[in-house]
């Protein structure tokens, strides 16, 4: 399958999550599979996709500079983090699934009792993460991610190499979803997942609830 158009990170999925954490005193590092420049899905910059909050961060030169000069997964220490968050965008379908360095970082954070989280197609980053004994960290967990019906609604269900919802189920996860484009996030243990671009804020809020209940 070939999408035949540029893709990459869906910007709003970073902004909405980061905004909640910044307001609660967290520092955030930005990491990508190969470090450096992060490709941005041009569709996420369309006027009808950008909220006032999105424009605020997009026009923040310091923020965008950091996002444009990401770290590599092996350049950071897992013990420094309370959470790892995989933002989505169709580009992650190709970039996240088989990246061993991201998987190793995620495993270490998970086994340190840190939160492992994602939104939308970012859930692909969790598909092949295993614990030290080789068990999938999402097998038996309740999760969500970009739904088949949403993929069909944007006309890309037959253009992508696999569907996020199907792959989560194939890993033994219990998949749940809300209505198309509704804010929907679930937490199971310290795995937190959001369904779509509308759900980044909800993922961050569930992380804060988890931290406050510890």
At which residue positions do the language-model features occur?
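Extended, subdomain-level signal for the structured scaffold at the beginning of enzyme domains
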Residues: 1-112, 124-214
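Catalytic nucleophile serine of serine hydrolases
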Residues: 120
């Amino acid at each position: 399958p070939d999408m035949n158009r540029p893709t990459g990170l869906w910007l709003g999925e970073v902004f909405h999550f980061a905004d909640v954490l910044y307001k609660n005193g967290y520092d955030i590092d930005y990491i990508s599979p190969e470090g450096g420049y992060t490709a941005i899905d041009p569709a996420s910059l369309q006027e009808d996709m950008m909220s006032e909050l999105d424009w605020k961060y997009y026009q923040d030169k310091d923020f965008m500079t950091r996002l444009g000069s990401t770290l590599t997964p092996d350049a950071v220490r897992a013990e420094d983090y309370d959470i790892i968050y995989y933002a989505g965008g169709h580009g992650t379908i190709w970039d996240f699934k088989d990246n061993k360095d991201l998987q190793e970082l995620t495993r270490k954070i998970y086994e340190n009792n840190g939160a492992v989280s994602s939104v939308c197609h970012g859930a692909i980053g969790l598909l092949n993460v295993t614990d030290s004994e080789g068990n999938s960290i999402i097998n038996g967990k309740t999760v969500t991610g970009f739904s088949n019906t949403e993929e069909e609604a944007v006309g890309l269900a037959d253009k992508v190499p696999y569907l996020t919802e199907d792959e989560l189920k194939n890993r033994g996860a219990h998949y749940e979803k809300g209505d198309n484009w509704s804010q929907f996030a679930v937490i199971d243990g310290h795995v937190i997942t959001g369904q779509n671009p509308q759900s980044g804020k909800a993922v961050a809020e569930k992380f804060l609830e988890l931290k406050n209940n510890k």
